From Swiss-Prot:
It comes from Homo sapiens (Human). One of its GO terms (molecular function) is protein domain specific binding. Keywords: Acetylation, Endosome, Golgi apparatus, Membrane, Phosphoprotein, Protein transport, Transmembrane, Transmembrane helix, Transport. Functions in post-Golgi recycling pathways. Acts as a recycling carrier to the cell surface. Interacts with SYNRG and ITSN1. Interacts with SLC9A7. It is found in: Golgi apparatus, trans-Golgi network membrane; Recycling endosome membrane. This is Secretory carrier-associated membrane protein 1. The modification N-acetylserine is found at residue 2. One of its GO terms (biological process) is post-Golgi vesicle-mediated transport. It is a multi-pass membrane protein. Widely expressed, with highest expression in brain. The keyword Transport applies. The gene is SCAMP1.
């Protein structure tokens, strides 16, 4: 009956103990169960039952980003490797030099026992004339000078071949112009003259200078080689009636016959190359000469020592002295008689 006596317009939850604000606040903070989970509710609501979601593994490949600065141990390892490589290189160089010195020492011992046998020019054994010089770069020339001496030897050979080709160039020019007989004859003379003279007058002094560190032979080489360079320049110029297929003669021959002119131009280019290479090698040899400690005073001393130790000079001096003494004695004896 009490329900009928209540006010129909009153709040029905007024007397409900479960609608009390303190109770509803506590029940609201409790996470809903699985049956009450609403997927469309606020995303900030934690998963039902307080279940922790498993971590999703990262499917991207693991890539290490290179660092700009290497670790300290890497730098130390690199420096150690470089130092070890440098030591190995020096050791190999020292072993190579030691082997070269041992080989030269053995060869010198063999030469001292059996004597030096001339081996240049390399002529056949049945040839009526034998070799005139002994030449062995590995035995006579120090290692640091062998390359330079070999280049000078190749330069001499190059000039000899150019002189030989010059004969054929002048012969071809003589075939198209009979007035060039003088050039053809002189070309043969230059080949027969300059080939042996250049070998004896400047190459052998250079070879001996580096072999025995002789200042006097260096000065002989410089004097003769300057003259040789002047000859190269004149041959490259090619004046008429000089026996050279230089540029002047080549242009004249080109006007007369094109094939002959082309042949002469090639020879003129070879003469020019000889002149240029000669100048370059002269500067190189002069630079090496300054590093050897040679000087003009040493050259004078070597010349005086060589002259005084020469048996021919000693014999001539003794004969001159005896002749002067005998003539002086005779003059004195005649003066006493008078």
């Amino acid at each position: 009956m009490s329900d009928f006596d209540s006010n129909p317009f009153a709040d029905p939850d007024l007397n409900n103990p479960f609608k009390d604000p303190s109770v509803t606040q506590v029940t609201r903070n409790v996470p809903p169960g699985l049956d009450e989970y609403n997927p469309f509710s606020d995303s900030r609501t934690p998963p039902p039952g307080g279940v922790k979601m498993p971590n999703v593994p990262n499917t991207q490949p693991a890539i290490m980003k290179p660092t700009e600065e290497h670790p300290a141990y890497t730098q130390i390892a690199k420096e150690h490797a470089l130092a070890q490589a440098e030591l190995l290189k020096r050791q190999e160089e020292l072993e190579r030099k030691a082997a070269e010195l041992d080989r030269r020492e053995r060869e010198m011992q063999n030469l001292s026992q059996h004597g030096r046998k001339n081996n240049w020019p390399p002529l056949p054994s049945n040839f009526p004339v034998g070799p005139c010089f002994y030449q062995d770069f590995s035995v006579d020339i120090p290692v640091e000078f062998q390359k330079t001496v070999k280049l000078m030897y190749y330069l001499w050979m190059f000039h000899a071949v150019t002189l030989f080709l010059n004969i054929f160039g002048c012969l071809a020019w003589f075939c198209v112009d009979s007035a060039r007989a003088v050039d053809f004859g002189l070309s043969i003379l230059w080949f027969l003259l300059f080939t042996p003279c250049s070998f004896v007058c400047w190459y052998r002094p250079l070879y001996g200078a580096f072999r025995s560190d002789s200042s006097f032979r260096f000065f002989v080489f410089f004097f003769v080689y300057i003259c040789q360079f002047a000859v190269h320049v004149l041959q490259a110029a090619g004046f008429h009636n000089w026996g050279n297929c230089g540029w002047i003669s080549s242009l004249t021959g080109l006007n007369q016959n094109i094939p002959v002119g082309i042949m002469m131009i090639i020879i003129a280019a070879l003469f020019t190359a000889s002149a240029v290479i000669s100048l370059v090698m002269f500067k190189k040899v002069h630079g090496l000469y300054r590093t050897t400690g040679a000087s003009f005073e040493k050259a004078q001393q070597e010349f005086a020592t060589g002259v005084m130790s020469n048996k021919t000079v000693q014999t001539a001096a003794a004969n001159a002295a005896s002749t002067a003494a005998s003539s002086a004695a005779q003059n004195a004896f005649k003066g006493n008689q008078i």
